[in-house]
């Protein structure tokens, strides 16, 4: 018997589900990413000084770059803000624009606002074709992962979210 596999989403059948507790959320990632990515969860992440400005949930890294230099390889981070913390940090930010350096409001639920945070500088190894190829693959495949994150956790999609290299709103798909 298939455990919760969507008929309309065969390619996602081979997934690893990661979860965090504060807030309780899950992220389904393709099993194939095991070879090319490192995913850190809240429990693995040393909360930076920014923790007061939101809770880091998940971080995706390209494996070749990250194993060479832990300051490299970041593809994106998912961050949850309470509504108050969000307002304190960003004020009355326009959710249809990129906020901060490169942050995108993916959606919200009754308690939190969820941001996709992209690095502002090059994160793959520029002299390494494998790193570049894998980095681009992770960016492309993140669309399904991030859309799934919103759907699986019943997060209301920010329909005005600007397009990023990792995520675009699929208009009308989750009405």
Segments predicted by a language model, with ranges:
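Short, acidic/polar N-cap/turn motifs at the starts of alpha helices
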Residues: 13-17, 24, 103
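N-terminal, intrinsically disordered, polar/charged segments of Gram-positive cell-envelope systems
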Residues: 1-18, 161-175
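Extracellular/lumen-exposed scaffold segments
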Residues: 89-90
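Surface-exposed amphipathic alpha-helical segments
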Residues: 116-175
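Secretory pathway targeting signatures of secreted, lumenal, and periplasmic proteins
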Residues: 22-85
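Short, surface-exposed beta-strand/loop "edge" segments at domain boundaries and coil↔beta transitions
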Residues: 26, 64-74, 114-115, 121-131
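Short, surface-exposed beta-strand/loop micro-motifs that present aromatic residues
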Residues: 97-108
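Short, solvent-exposed coil/turn segments at beta-strand boundaries
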Residues: 31-32, 108-113, 119
């Amino acid at each position: 018997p298939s455990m919760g596999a969507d008929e309309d989403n065969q390619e996602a059948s081979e997934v690893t589900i990661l979860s965090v507790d504060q807030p309780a959320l899950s992220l389904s990632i393709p099993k194939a990413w095991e070879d090319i990515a490192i995913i850190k969860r809240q429990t693995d992440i040393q909360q930076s000084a920014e923790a007061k400005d939101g809770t880091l949930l998940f971080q995706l890294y390209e494996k070749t770059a990250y194993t060479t230099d832990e300051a490299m390889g970041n593809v994106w981070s998912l961050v949850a803000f309470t509504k108050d913390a969000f307002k304190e940090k960003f004020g009355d930010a326009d959710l249809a624009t990129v906020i901060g350096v490169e942050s995108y409001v993916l959606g919200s639920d009754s308690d939190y606002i969820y941001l996709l945070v992209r690095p502002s500088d090059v994160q793959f190894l520029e002299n390494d074709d494998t790193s570049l190829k894998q980095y681009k693959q992770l960016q492309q495949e993140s669309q399904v992962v991030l859309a799934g994150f919103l759907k699986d956790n019943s997060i209301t999609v920010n329909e005005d979210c600007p397009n990023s290299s990792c995520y675009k709103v699929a208009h009308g798909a989750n009405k």
